[in-house]
Curated annotation (Swiss-Prot):
One of its GO terms (cellular component) is nucleus. Controls the development of red pulp macrophages required for red blood cells recycling and iron homeostasis. Transcription factor that binds to the PU-box, a purine-rich DNA sequence (5'-GAGGA[AT]-3') that can act as a lymphoid-specific enhancer. Regulates VCAM1 gene expression. GO terms for molecular function: DNA-binding transcription activator activity, RNA polymerase II-specific; DNA-binding transcription factor activity, RNA polymerase II-specific; RNA polymerase II cis-regulatory region sequence-specific DNA binding. This is Transcription factor Spi-C.
Length: 248
């Protein structure tokens, strides 16, 4: 690796940590526990470079209870300002996380048909177009005389220039049938959400801590040492600064 490449690598590495620092010191009001969490993940012991690029060893790191760390972060999300703004929301609003996604602006995921249908089922104003048949099982039915109205509203929600028809919307529903997200029931204009979709769109999924935990910590992974992370950082950090002191 040439000196120029080494400099670029070192600069890119420092830039990455600068971005992390900027994100962790913004204008948001963090809880004390969450600030402790940020301090933990940003903790980096100082290591001096030596004459060998491969001789750098990480300093001894204490072993942390990773569930406690994750819990601190979760408390920020679920017990801070976000939770306070959601705790008084009615069921009709709570089951519509897609609405929050839409407000994010550029770069946000587009609203999908199954999300729109699920949202409409909890909207009293849409009761004349779509209704639950068995809410617990996720079975719903389009109202025959107003199915075209529902399709038209869906097209407008998507931002289509041409008018959306029920026939086109039904074609999309058949595609969901192939993937298993929504299946057709042997009853006129009746469909069923899959269990996975119901869980994904449920309030408990939107606000539950357990899902947050399960994505970060495996059941048998009670404790996690930060040695590996620090080793990677120390190796690059020390090598970069050592190489900067060598004449190219």
């Amino acid at each position: 690796m040439t000196c120029v490449e080494q400099d670029k690598l070192g600069q890119a590495f420092e830039d990455a940590f600068e971005v992390l620092r900027q994100h962790s010191t913004g204008d948001l009001q963090y809880s004390p526990d969450y600030r402790n969490y940020l301090a933990l993940i940003n903790h980096r012991p100082h290591v001096k470079g030596n004459s060998s690029c491969y001789g750098v060893l990480p300093t001894e790191e204490p072993v942390y209870n990773w569930r406690t760390v994750i819990n601190s972060a979760a408390d920020f999300y679920f017990e801070g300002n976000i939770h306070q703004s959601l705790q008084n929301i009615t069921e009709n609003q709570l089951v519509q996380p897609t609405l929050l996604q839409q407000k994010g602006g550029k770069g946000r995921k587009k609203l999908r048909l199954f999300e729109y249908l699920h949202e409409s089922l909890y909207n009293p104003e849409m009761a004349s177009c779509i209704q639950w048949v068995d809410k617990t099982k996720g079975i719903f039915q389009f109202v025959s005389k107003n199915k075209e109205k529902l399709a038209e509203l869906w097209g407008k929600r998507k931002g289509n220039r041409k008018t959306m028809t029920y026939q086109k919307m039904a074609r999309a529903l058949r595609n969901y049938g192939r993937s298993g997200e929504i299946t057709k029931i042997r009853r006129k204009l009746t469909y069923q959400f899959s269990e996975a979709i119901l869980q994904r769109l449920s309030p408990s999924y939107f606000l539950g801590k357990e899902i947050f935990y399960s994505q970060c910590v495996q059941p048998d992974q009670e404790y996690l040492s930060l040695n590996n992370w620090n080793a990677n950082y120390n190796y690059t950090y020390a090598n970069y600064h050592e190489l900067n002191h060598h004449d190219c």
